[in-house]
């Protein structure tokens, strides 16, 4: 199922940040969000993931299909690596964590408490959770933060494998992940203009 976004307006702190956002994300496709810091990429991802409502526009194809990885890894520090993955697998009604351990080279760390991991190891564990959700649409906010070159390659390989099985990915990143056939959406030109701000504010109070 294609994720479709039509004429979306998103807000931060009640202020419109982006307007006129439209795109389709098909099965097996990746879309890279680009733009300077503060341009609205995180706000757009949070809106698409259902963490905040849009001010205007339509989103379809996301219902119970999204796995979202934010800046924070959100790990349970007193659980081991394997226990963290089992916890999140259970949340999504699943149990197999072996592919996640393998994809992010976490086998040797499986019994380590998450709180004792390095920043890069924590990030790998946070990203590995995507594989245990079973969700077909991945949305990721700067997923390569704290990762070294080898770990970035692991992540890119995991995304490619996900796309090959019909999954899709929407990724905000400043680096080239080398994903084949990935499209790019620059949010810079979609910054809400003063006219859009006024119109959106009026509509919000109708």
Curated annotation (Swiss-Prot):
Transmembrane segments: none annotated. Residues 3-206 form the ABC transporter domain. One of its GO terms (cellular component) is plasma membrane. It is found in: Cell inner membrane. Keywords: ATP-binding, Cell inner membrane, Cell membrane, Cytochrome c-type biogenesis, Membrane, Nucleotide-binding, Translocase, Transport. Its main location: membrane. ATP binds at residues 35-42. It is a peripheral membrane protein. GO terms for biological process: cytochrome complex assembly. Its EC number is 7.6.2.5. GO terms for molecular function: ABC-type heme transporter activity; ATP binding; ATP hydrolysis activity. It catalyses: heme b(in) + ATP + H2O = heme b(out) + ADP + phosphate + H(+). InterPro entries: AAA+_ATPase, ABC_transporter-like_ATP-bd, ABC_transporter-like_CS, ABC_transptr_haem_export_CcmA, P-loop_NTPase. Part of the ABC transporter complex CcmAB involved in the biogenesis of c-type cytochromes; once thought to export heme, this seems not to be the case, but its exact role is uncertain. Responsible for energy coupling to the transport system. The complex is composed of two ATP-binding proteins (CcmA) and two transmembrane proteins (CcmB). Belongs to the ABC transporter superfamily. CcmA exporter (TC 3.A.1.107) family. This is Cytochrome c biogenesis ATP-binding export protein CcmA. It comes from Roseobacter denitrificans (strain ATCC 33942 / OCh 114) (Erythrobacter sp. (strain OCh 114)). The lineage of its organism: Bacteria, Pseudomonadati, Pseudomonadota, Alphaproteobacteria, Rhodobacterales. The gene is ccmA.
């Amino acid at each position: 199922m294609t994720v479709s976004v039509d004429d979306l307006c998103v807000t931060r702190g009640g202020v419109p940040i982006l307007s006129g956002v439209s795109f389709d994300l098909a099965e097996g496709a990746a879309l890279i969000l680009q733009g300077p810091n503060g341009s609205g990429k995180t706000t757009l991802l949070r809106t698409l993931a259902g963490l905040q409502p849009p001010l205007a526009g339509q989103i379809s194809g996301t219902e119970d299909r999204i796995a979202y990885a934010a800046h924070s890894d959100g790990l349970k520090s007193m659980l081991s690596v394997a226990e963290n993955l089992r916890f999140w697998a259970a949340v999504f009604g699943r149990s197999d964590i072996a592919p996640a351990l393998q994809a992010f080279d976490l086998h040797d760390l499986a019994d380590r408490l998450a709180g004792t991991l390095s920043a890069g190891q924590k990030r790998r564990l946070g990203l590995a959770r995507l594989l245990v959700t079973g969700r077909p649409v991945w949305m990721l906010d700067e997923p390569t933060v704290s990762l070294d070159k080898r770990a970035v390659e692991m992540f890119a390989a995991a995304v490619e494998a996900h796309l090959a099985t019909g999954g899709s990915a929407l990724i905000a990143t400043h680096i080239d992940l080398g994903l084949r056939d990935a499209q790019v959406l620059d949010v810079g030109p979609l910054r809400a203009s003063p006219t859009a701000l006024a119109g959106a504010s009026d509509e919000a109070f109708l």
